[in-house]
Each structure stands twice: as structure tokens, then as C-alpha cells.
Amino acid sequence: MKDLTMLLDELKDMSFFNKGDICLIGCSTSEVIGEKIGTVGSMEVAETIFNALDVVSKETGVTFAFQGCEHINRAITIEKSQFNPLTMEEVSVVPDVHAGGSLATYAFQHMKDPIVVEHITVPCGIDIGQTLIGMHIKHVCVPVRTSVKQVGQAIVTIATSRPKKIGGERAKYQ
């Protein structure tokens, strides 16, 4: 998937991925292949995307989390080593192609020690196919513009975050 490789390379060049961070991935494999979100799904597309992200993880030290679809309330598949019981609640669900989506399913099947959490707050994310990852991005969410606008047929939206600016007109900011 040339466009995915180009996108990930561009994000690496921008220093979008930071060692130790968790980057959220939302993906409709249906949209990638030109179909309506949630209709056909593709484990083959999921495998391609997961493997490309795995390479980025090994190169940059970023960890990826995978958002499931609305049928599992957009719950997040993560490595158990990333679990923080003070800020996350584990839920009892296993992502499935028809309830969770192909990429979350593939990730759950291929991660070392996966668990699913109800909610997560991460500093950045990549949304492939308008899966609505914003609910899991740390405030304040900031769009990231890239030259790659689609992966396959799916629209790509990328977000990072910045600290809130508080204090009013007399406050100073960096």
C-alpha cells in the first residue's frame, strides 16, 4: 500500500511519532477498499496496515493502540504493558470483524499480550476512514496536515495535541 507507506514516512519525517508515546489508530478497512464503513471489512487490508505500523513502532519506539468500531463502543485494543489502572478500565470483549472491525481484530490476534480498555487518552492518532478517534485524543486536539490525504479510498485525518492555554489576557505562553 504505497499511500500508507508515504503517509507513515512523512509523519516520521515530521517527528510525529515519539518514543514511549501511544498513537491511536482508527481504521475502516471497508473505506480503504472503497466501500461504506462497517460493511465488508478486510483482514488482508488489516494485516497490511498492522504490519506497516509494526515497522514504524520498531523504528521510532511509539506504541500503537487500535480503536474498535461503535459496536464495541469504540473500545481500544492495547498491549497489556501499556495498561494504567489509574486512567484506564479494562473491558470484557474480544474484537471481531463484525463487532470491533478488522484492524482491531487483527491487532488483538497478533499483539503479544492484548487487552481491551473502554477509554484511553493519547497524544496523537491517525484516523483512516473517518472512524471518529477524537474522543480518545488528549485535549487540545490539533489537526496535522500531510500531503497524503487518503489510504486506498479512505480519507485520512491526523491529530496531535497541545497543552491547554489557560489564564486569560495576562497569562504568558511558550
Curated annotation (Swiss-Prot):
InterPro entries: Antibiotic_NAT-like, DUF436. It comes from the Bacteria. SUPFAM superfamilies: TTHA0583/YokD-like. It holds the Pfam family DUF436. Belongs to the UPF0340 family. This is UPF0340 protein SAB1998c. The lineage of its organism: Bacteria, Bacillati, Bacillota, Bacilli, Bacillales.
